[in-house]
Swiss-Prot record:
Domain of life: Eukaryota
Species the sequence originates in: Homo sapiens (Human)
Name of the protein described by the UniProt record: Rhotekin
Region ranges (Disordered): 96-116, 518-563
Gene: RTKN
Keywords: Apoptosis, Coiled coil, GTP-binding, Methylation, Nucleotide-binding, Phosphoprotein
Length: 563
């Protein structure tokens, strides 16, 4: 039998040795209760479990390949986060039990070791070059094989991912535009990068098999026959029945494969672009295999908190240069590699220029000393820096011994952080805040442009006239005089349009586009009836040259049927 403490979420067996220790008073049940950080981790774990359930339902309801790829990617990320959170939660529980039960409260152990500050780590400008073969990149003129790839990044128990990228042989590298930021990292961090990929045209794909076969048939049988076969296949697939030549494909979710991975540490941090080696984890027989070059290019930056946030502040007295008895009272702020001295505490918040700036770097020497106590200022702090052959020393005074100890502790902690974060404390590296993730773009149609073009018989003389006038490119500022014959029509062509300046064709030769359209006797409009023509005013007298222009005018206006 078990008794559960619902408040602390601890299960203790009745009659067990642990319960006997509780009764004897050696242990307290609160030692095994959840800490605030453990509660937050448990909340994240519950959230990812719900996200995984939603991803499974979404994957089962997907009807398009791109939707299935995104759902499978979300499912893989959720599973990775769940495993990471469970492992971290178990590790914290074990450390909590071992740390609090290994020694009794009366035991006096060694003081706690100094720990470095935390920081932020950001990776951006991720590029993975590809190495295509000549037969695949230059000589392959068939259908494009496509892959869907993304990066999974893990730092400690935190896992993030990039957007999904579609890759084919037209790309020379895989470029990820998003910046990935980890807000909680130590100087001993290990950032693991994993590249996952899935073939878009994988066997068992949701769509695409019958269409690819129809494309091949249309190209092999010819334009007319192939178009009829392709139309029959499309109609069969759209009506819900099975295609004529292929059975219904088996619906199954895509599968991502691990293609390559690498691990980046503090040594890889640099305020610039850098290349790192990749460990390939896939072979050429894998359907998701990509010709990776074996390296990844990125910018890895880090910002320790000691470089971006103040570590100590308080009232100080600074000795003026060359004056032993003249001390100026300032407000000191230790931030990054500088000790800023302001006239007033408000100046630090408003961004005013400091009165004095004292450098504090890895080469700085700090010494605490005491002057004559009769002067009333016994607690001093000396900061020395070497500038070439000269040594500059600034002497500071604190108000009490506790304030002096506080400043010394802050300075020693800063020196320890510099020794752990190394090159990250030379200067502040720029880190951009990641932009919100954009929704995934729909997959673009791929295939031959020849089969995607709708080629119809060119029996419309208006379409041919537009093509000819676009090639000529000439324009008329005013409409031609023969356009007055067609003023009774409801829609007139624009005189500035390219169609009004088409060259006059020679009607003595057969037309290359076939027989033009003619007027139908059954479809004469009311304004073109014989009665309307009998009362219409006669056109003005024209010269023979003008009459020639009327007879050889724009074919679009006098040959096109108004029906």
């Amino acid at each position: 039998m078990f008794s559960r403490n619902h408040r602390s979420r601890v299960t203790v067996a009745r009659g067990s040795a642990l319960e006997m220790e509780f009764k004897r008073g050696r242990f307290r049940l609160s030692l095994f209760s959840d800490l605030p950080e453990d509660t937050e981790l448990q909340r994240k774990l519950d959230h990812e479990i719900r996200m995984r359930e939603g991803a499974c339902k979404l994957l089962a309801a997907c009807s398009q390949r791109e939707q299935a790829l995104e759902a499978t990617k979300s499912l893989l990320v959720c599973n990775s986060r769940i495993l990471s959170y469970m492992g971290e939660l178990q590790r914290r529980k074990e450390a909590q039990v071992l740390g609090k039960t290994s020694r009794r409260p009366s035991d006096s152990g060694p003081p706690a070791e100094r720990s470095p500050c935390r920081g932020r780590v950001c990776i951006s400008d991720l590029r993975i070059p590809l190495m295509w073969k000549d037969t695949e990149y230059f000589k392959n003129k068939g259908d494009l094989h496509r892959w869907a790839v993304f990066l999974l990044l893990q730092l400690g128990e935190h896992i993030q991912d990039t957007e999904m990228i579609l890759v084919d042989r037209t790309l020379t590298d895989i470029s990820f535009q998003s910046n990935v930021l980890f807000a909680e990292a130590g100087p001993d961090f290990e950032l693991r990068l994993e590249l996952y990929g899935a073939c878009v045209e994988e066997e068992g794909a949701l769509t695409g098999g019958p269409k690819r076969l129809a494309t091949k048939l249309s190209s092999s049988l010819g334009r007319s026959s192939g178009r009829r076969v392709r139309a029959s296949l499309d109609s069969a697939g759209g009506s819900g029945s099975s295609p004529i030549l292929l059975p219904t494909p088996v619906v199954g979710g895509p599968r991502y494969h691990l293609l390559a991975h690498t691990t980046l540490t503090l040594a890889a941090v640099q305020d610039g672009f850098r290349t790192h080696d990749l460990t390939l984890a896939s072979h050429e027989e894998n359907p998701a295999w990509l010709p990776l070059y074996g390296s990844v290019c990125c910018r890895l930056a880090a910002q320790p908190l000691c470089m971006t946030q103040p570590t100590a502040s308080g009232t100080l007295r600074v000795q003026q240069a060359g004056e032993m008895q003249n001390w100026a009272q300032v407000h000191g702020v230790l931030k990054g590699t500088n000790l800023f001295c302001y006239r007033q505490p408000e100046d630090a918040d408003t961004g005013e220029e400091p009165l004095l700036t004292i450098a504090v770097n890895k080469e700085t020497r700090v010494r605490a000393g005491e002057l004559d106590q009769a002067l009333g200022r016994p607690f001093t702090l000396s900061i020395s820096n070497q500038y070439g052959d000269d040594e500059v020393t600034h002497t500071l005074q604190t108000e009490s011994r506790e304030a002096l100890q506080s400043w010394m502790e802050a300075l020693w902690q800063l020196f320890f952080d510099m020794s752990q974060w190394k090159q990250c404390c030379d200067e502040i590296m720029k880190i951009e805040t990641p932009a919100p993730r954009k929704p995934p773009q729909a997959l673009a149609k791929q295939g031959s442009l020849y089969h995607e073009m709708a080629i119809e018989p060119l029996d419309d003389i208006a379409a041919v006239t537009d093509i000819l006038t676009q090639r000529e490119g000439a324009r008329l500022e005013t409409p031609p005089p023969w356009l007055a014959m067609f003023t009774d029509q409801p829609a007139l062509p624009n005189p500035c349009s390219p169609a009004s300046v088409a060259p006059a064709p020679d009607w003595t030769h057969p037309l290359p586009w076939g027989r033009p359209r003619t007027f139908s006797l059954d479809a004469v409009p009311p304004d073109h009836s014989p009665r309307a023509r009998s009362v219409a005013p006669l056109p003005p007298q024209r010269s023979p040259r003008t009459r020639g222009l009327c007879s050889k005018g724009q074919p679009r206006t006098w040959l096109q049927s108004p029906v």
